[in-house]
Amino acid sequence: MKVLLGAVNAKYIHSNLAVYCLKAYAEKYGDTSDEISIGEYTINQQLDEILRDIYKRKPDMLCLSCYIWNLTYVEEICREIKKVMPQIIIWIGGPEVSYDGVKVLERLPEVDGVMKGEGEQTFCDLLHFYQDKTADGLQNMKGIVYREQTGQIVENEWRKTMDLSKVPFVYENMELFEHKIIYYETSRGCPFSCSYCLSSIDKCLRFRDLELVKKELQFFIDHKVPQVKFVDRTFNCKHDHAMTVWHYIKEHDNGITNFHFEVAADLLNEEEMELIKTMRPGLIQLEIGVQSTNLDTIREIHRTMKFEQVAEVVRRINSYGNVHQHLDLIAGLPYEDYESFGKSFDDVYALEPEQLQLGFLKVLKGSYMEEKKDDYGLVYKGMPPYEVLYTKWLPYEDTLRLKGIEEMVETYYNSRQFCYTLPYLIRHFKRPFTLFEKLAEYYEENGLDTLSHARTARYEILYDFARFYDAERCEAYKQLLTLDFYLRENAKSRPLFAGDERISKEEFRLFYDREDEERCYLENYENMEKRQLRKMTHIERFSYDVLGDMKEEECVLLFDYQNRNPLDHQAKVFCVTEEIRELCKQ
């Protein structure tokens, strides 16, 4: 029997860990002669393209992995492929269908069954069943919802959780994952009970054997994988486990591979903090879910978090200067209105994370949040991703306002392109939330929200916005935007707002002549000629102390683009004001 495991990913750079686990597990433990293959697609592909690929592969059985971002697309595939391959057996699985399998099969007569929860052993049992119909029937198989020949839908009991160490390592052939993000898990389940999350349903927390984990981490390190994203729901919930992994990647660091972890900041203890402090800049990045700082909200969603403790940890890690921190907020939670969310936003913004994700509540099937929707006046979209429209605290008009703010945060904060301009702008607006609120209004009023803007155009727009609200400090904004621009862009054509205040050709020549004779700043360019030095660097004159307190005084900066900060990708900067002055005196 030919079996195709299909995955419809959100982006090409993503890979689907689940289908690779099912294939590897079945090939190791399944007593079958089935030919199992994997087909990975994206939601950006045309449906016809995916149907053609499935049809040409001629599978007898098609298994599709379902998530909140692809369910609608997967359902369409099921409906259409059954028309052109009426004999095909179709099973689906994944978190988006595990908790309402009966309704899914009622909605999709083309589908034969749903695999609930962990699918490795269930998939093996299904292969055995279809290969040998004399085996125990589907009625005795745990972890499935299926359709009998009569059309009746039957839901069997859940399967017990499995030993995670039995799942084979899926990345032996790295050619399959070239240019893709590597996902890796060392634990399943979650110790917390957050009402908006399906992970809270799985209370059986289990871990992969650490000796296996070390061996697999070494594989990633040896292959110089750019990034490994751990999918563990709360990686540091078990101290010894986290410390072992972190010690290993630190001691075996190849200077290239980055590891991404979701952590609970308030669980990080002194020993873990001290270890993090010693890591190479960029070795790890931490994703920390705050969601809200409203105490009533935190209590209602069953979240165990002390924000003061989280804030202390985030600030301390920030002071190390070696870890990218990504903090999350969720709009649409109970007891959180527009003003309350604004306060949560300001609280998190003050921690200065590298990324601040403003997300919107997704009402997942089977979650406690879905049960309480009527109590909360919670209305959400009927199609995946089931995103909140409004609640009794947050009217739809305010949801739309927050959508605009989300876009501005993504464009102007998370891009890390405006690290000097934004703090200066906030002084005028008093609080960060107001700045992004007004910026979103400015975009809408000027018809900018419906257009696609080049990266460099964002600087021009922000300059116009700053002039509109704070014309008196127009020159200061021009200087700061020029600084931000050259920190990120090795551009030889000047932006319009930068003006003509640049170093002279003679100053330029004198500086690079001196640097060519004796490396005072650009030591890493030892074997480069003067012409190459100029290409990889930039010198800019400012009339304000842009790196300091913004006093009106001359400041000349050298930008080194070969040496960038691994956390925000900004060029290394040297103040060369005195050197330029001395050279001109000679």
Predicted regions and their residues:
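N-terminal [4Fe-4S]-dependent radical SAM core
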Residues: 1-2, 141, 145-186, 555, ...
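A short, glycine/small-residue-rich beta-strand->loop->alpha-helix junction that serves as a flexible
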Residues: 9-18, 66-71
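Radical SAM enzyme core and accessory elements
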Residues: 2-6, 47, 60, 407-586
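Radical SAM [4Fe-4S] cluster-binding motif and immediate context
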Residues: 165-319
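Glycine-rich beta-alpha loop elements in corrinoid/cobalamin-binding modules
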Residues: 25, 35-160
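A structural motif corresponding to the C-terminal lobe/cap of the Radical SAM core domain
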Residues: 8, 58-60, 239, 251-254, ...
